[in-house]
């Protein structure tokens, strides 16, 4: 505390306090800044008390002086009264006091009175200050005591809380230990059960395999036996033919001998010599051609599909030999069965022949060769950028902000269902964007997007990090060998953690330039637009480094990004032009479909007359809906396009039939036991990519017990013929973003068909999965509900051996199955014949209760045996 603060607290002037401090022997240099120590404050207080006492003493002395003066004046007055006359005379004779002296006396008196009053005020102020200080100290001590009390209470409460937490933690640990022991026991039981099932399954498979091998060996023996019979019959036929020829010649020789009787002996000798020569020649020929010295290796020209009989003829072997070889390879075939090129080449190589694979698409190769010669007028083209990433990480929202349109609201559930292609003009240049879906079911569509792109922008949410589809997108980008730019989205959220994203991506091999890698990172927000300009700049920088070029004229080439069937416009294909120019009126070949371009539209629906490289367009006029990913090329005329399309359709049909026949017998053996249930489905969707994604996802749900059988797929609305096919096959129709026609709806209502509409793919997957779970046979689990110990055995003429028991645990039920255990070994399984308590028949007996029971068809119950009662519970199985 400084001097000024102390003076203010004591309510005295600073000068007076300085006088007191100097009288106390304390040196002060700065009134405002010098701080008084506690010892100095005590010394000042003591000096002020001493000064107060001194002042009081002086005051008392002054009062006594005044009193004596007053007494003397009274005596003088009396004397004056007695001597009035003399006094008057003396007063008149005395010298008078001047006014100046009187004023001085009055001033001195007033000064003394003021000094006394000031001292009294100072003393009073000092006492008040001391009282205030004492009161403040008392309040401070009270607050300190109260604070210490609160701290003690807080410490005590914290100790109680810690004790409660420790007790709760111990209780939780005990519960966790009990739960783990229970789970371990259940896991052990499940493992034993699974082991038994596995052993039974392996045993069944071994039996089936042995049976199949036995049938195969029997078939091989039948073929060999048939061949031996054929060879024996052929040999017998040759011998009989020779014998007939030999007999007829001898007859003719005999006749000639009779006619020429003079030369009979010479004729017989000539005939015998001639016959011996023919016999030797026949023997030599037979030995030379029946058993070749070395196998003959021939060059076999194998087309894309060939029957078993035609392949055997080309190799100059019997069809039975070829069938036998395929049986040894594990395939059961017939002589008229179609083989694909790969299988035929494998068989030819196995039988020691050389093969040449033929291509029957010379016209197609000629068209492709003409298109590849288009190398003139090369210009810089816009980069094709594919937006990839996990579902709900903001891919479409990011592209939506760049395009300044609302697309997400139009997607079902805010999830992109198929690839969208957009051409965006920015201040820095033109960029073509492909927006791919992030749901797990659309793997094939993301792979197509990576294959037709120049740059992949991987969108990762800053608050979610790396997810399964993020990893898959990285793999697609690496497989396509395209550069990867990472856009860390949702940076406007408080929980955004870009460092975590960089760390997780580095584990997948995507390392940012900040960490010494080669991948560009942009931190953006699709909601606020933060970092969008930086992302576009990095895309264009990467495009400049790639030096993207394409022919600006000549034959147009591209790829089908997506296709659908529009009710009013027919087949509509989204095509990305990669080189050359596509014009309205050109003849186009897209996969197995062809047609003349009737109209070309951009992403905004504006009609175009022509489209150059890196331009996405919607094309109308094809004969059908091509598959997503099919190559597109402009052909010279419609006749040539039709020939190539028909050739491709025929070959696709042959290959499909060959593959179906290849697995037909295997499926027959697998389904012979009739244990596999099937869920038959028909899939109709709006675009080809959704059909593929939905079909692939549903096929992956198949198990050993329940299989998904997709009888047909297609795009467009559901027609009456679709419903008839579904009804004939007892199939459920999955309608994805399409609707049924009026006739089809009426037929479904009349016949009771099953039609389901979906707009989000995982809802369809979940419903089919639930239907498949309903076809799974439930798991039967045995739960022990009671245990009793046999204390005595009684013999009854009516019931045989009756066991007197006491229920140790749970309860015994009369109608539940039981086991008889002796030394913890099951010696009998059956059911109770009777259950009594005293003389009354009861349905159940609980723990701690005695009872008598009889085991049906079992009389060897002994004292010490245990009766275990259990029940079988059906548990619904999950896929």
Curated annotation (Swiss-Prot):
CDD domains: IF2_eIF5B, IF2_mtIF2_II, mtIF2_IVc. One of its GO terms (molecular function) is translation initiation factor activity. Keywords: Cytoplasm, GTP-binding, Initiation factor, Nucleotide-binding, Protein biosynthesis. Signal peptide: none annotated. GO terms for cellular component: cytosol. This is Translation initiation factor IF-2. Residues 489-492 are annotated as: G4. Residues 164-173 have a biased composition (Low complexity). One of the essential components for the initiation of protein synthesis. Protects formylmethionyl-tRNA from spontaneous hydrolysis and promotes its binding to the 30S ribosomal subunits. Also involved in the hydrolysis of GTP during the formation of the 70S ribosomal complex. Pfam families: EF-G_D2 (PF22042), GTP_EFTU (PF00009), GTP_EFTU_D2 (PF03144), IF-2 (PF11987), IF2_N (PF04760).
